[in-house]
Amino acid sequence: VMEGVALLHKSGLIHRGICPDNILLPIDGTAMLTGYGTLALRTGGSELKSQLYAGYAAPEQYSAAEFSGRYTDVYALAAVTYRLVTGQTPVSAPQRKVRDSMETAHSLESSVPTYFSQVLSCAMRLDPPSGCRPCRN
């Protein structure tokens, strides 16, 4: 899935709809990202907005005043990973903006290494442009 998103980004596209519902896992075990149906329209300057998936949509997707970028998909990938390792859907971005109450992955599942939990928290920061910069380190 991450390789597919990397190819999208290399092509200058942003998915904006990454969530468990858009990830298929066929019998051979190779995960596939779906939900591309309206990607061209969403990136072509149309008024069509991407569907928002609570817990997986980045904060900037809820605001017409903020821009989306690669960091939008990074947030969603981290949210999907958070769900994968904890079994819980992350708190939605609007709820977190009111009161940042999301527990770390490590606090929900002690087998998740602290450093990995910190990477997920970093990628899911509420301030979009700085959301993924620290995660490169």
Give the ranges of each region predicted by the language model.
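Activation segment
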Residues: 38-39
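Residue immediately N-terminal to the catalytic "proton-acceptor" Asp
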Residues: 16
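Protein kinase catalytic-loop region centered on the HRD/HxD motif
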Residues: 1-13
